[in-house]
């Protein structure tokens, strides 16, 4: 997997190495961020990238931001447009993509701070895994998930992913 040339920060295309978040931000320190990870599938017959269930992902992205009571929201239509711009800027062609949209508290403060909010979008080539054709083994874990009344598990919040 090669490193892309560009990422998107707050709607601006920036060089990959300049896509940074301050270490004192609440998003970095406390995981006060929400995200959607989605896939782009290259169709060689049509020479086009197809984004998998983008509308559904963006609905959940908006819901997650509202649930976290962020001071401002990045709406799905805007994030979709910025994602397409990023894909075009990187000139991705021929490979499937893993795309990550993240809204995060970019300001400093404690765990309860709700703004200001930043937006990052990254897209990286991710070829289809051999496991798709070869299969995998799985098991049921004995670990219990954190209950919804302890943390907002219905939201794709970065902090939730420390809990399995």
Residue ranges of predicted features:
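Short, glycine/charge-rich beta-strand/loop segments that flank catalytic centers
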Residues: 75-86, 94-109
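Cytochrome P450 catalytic-domain "roof"
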Residues: 91
């Amino acid at each position: 997997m090669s490193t892309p040339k560009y990422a998107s920060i707050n709607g601006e295309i920036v060089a990959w190495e300049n896509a940074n978040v301050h270490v004192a931000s609440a998003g970095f320190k406390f995981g006060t961020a929400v995200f959607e990870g989605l896939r782009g599938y290259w169709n060689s017959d049509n020479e086009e990238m197809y984004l998998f269930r983008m509308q559904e992902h963006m609905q959940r992205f908006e819901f997650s931001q509202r649930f976290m009571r962020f001071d401002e929201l990045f709406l799905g239509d805007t994030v979709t447009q910025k994602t397409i711009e990023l894909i075009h800027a990187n000139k991705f062609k021929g490979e499937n993509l893993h795309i990550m949209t993240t809204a995060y508290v970019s300001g400093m403060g404690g765990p309860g701070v709700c703004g200001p909010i930043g937006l990052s979008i990254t897209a990286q080539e991710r070829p289809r895994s051999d496991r798709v054709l070869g299969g995998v083994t799985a098991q049921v874990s004995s670990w219990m998930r954190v209950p919804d009344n302890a943390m907002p598990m219905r939201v794709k919040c970065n902090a939730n992913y420390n809990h399995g």
